[in-house]
A protein has these predicted regions:
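Macromolecular interaction modules
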Residues: 1-260
């Protein structure tokens, strides 16, 4: 079996947001359940809080489709007609040709940290459309697996990570993807600003926790974009608080207060 994740980055036609949500949680989920290897489908909405606030966020919504395929070359294309239903019904705003559907062969399933509360859903996710430096792929993966993945998922509110490679198997519309790899992180927090600020603080070595990230590997390319989203589908939502297997009392009360 092969784990695949397909991400659908999209915007919704004006006045059709409720129609799209109703379709996604209703008929679309029923159709997906009939596909071989289907595991889950969730939808998320872009958040005001971003770790790279100056980069464009071209998409308001992200849908994530998880599969465990026996024969990806046969089963992955079956997703295309289901995604086309939204386009055919006029639910997608692709007037600027920003819609993107990218499928990835995952290196592993979720790798969770001690922060993770397995009995609760994710509050949101972040994706990195990532690249490694040419000739240094093995070093890049080793750094992520042994250093960066574990340190990232121990940030308060961050709970799990998995990564994958852009698959040669894609569904329409097949459009440019700026990264060869997907870095997919899960959050469980009701204070994303806190999580984002402490991520940045740990990267700079100034976190009130005293925890500092290891130096960034030069095998990781700076040609990447990061996008944060909050859960926008289903019936179960994160109940509140910040998932953290540590002491939040070391953080000042105003740590996550917006500047100004």
């Amino acid at each position: 079996m092969s784990l695949y994740t397909t991400i659908h980055l999209h915007n919704v036609a004006a006045g059709r947001a409720e129609d799209y949500a109703r379709w996604f949680d209703g008929a679309h989920q029923q159709d997906l359940a009939r596909l071989r290897g289907f595991r889950s489908a969730d939808r998320y909405e872009v958040t005001p809080q971003q770790i790279m606030p100056d980069i464009p966020q071209p998409w308001r919504f992200l849908s994530v489709y998880e599969f465990d395929y026996a024969a990806p070359e046969i089963d992955l294309p079956a997703l295309a007609p289901l995604l086309a239903q939204a386009r055919d019904a006029g639910l997608i705003d692709d007037s600027d040709e920003s819609e993107r559907i990218h499928s990835y062969a995952m290196y592993s399933d979720w790798v969770a940290s001690p922060n993770h509360r397995a009995d609760q859903p994710f509050s949101g996710v972040s994706i990195i459309l990532a690249n490694f430096v040419a000739g240094r792929e093995a070093e890049y993966h080793h750094w992520y697996d042994t250093v960066h993945g574990p340190e990232v998922t121990r940030v308060p509110g961050k709970v799990a990570m998995k990564r994958g490679r852009l698959s040669p198997l894609q569904v329409e519309p097949r459009r440019y993807c700026p990264g060869s790899d997907l870095v997919f992180c899960a959050q469980q927090t009701d204070d994303l600003l806190f999580t984002v600020k402490d991520f940045s603080a740990r990267a700079r070595g100034v976190s009130p926790s005293g925890v500092a990230f290891q130096p960034r590997s030069s095998a990781g390319s700076f040609a990447r974009t990061v996008h944060y989203f909050a859960r926008a589908s289903g019936t179960r939502f994160w109940p509140g608080g910040i998932a953290y297997d540590g002491d939040l009392s070391v953080y000042p009360a105003d740590f996550a207060r917006p500047a100004g």
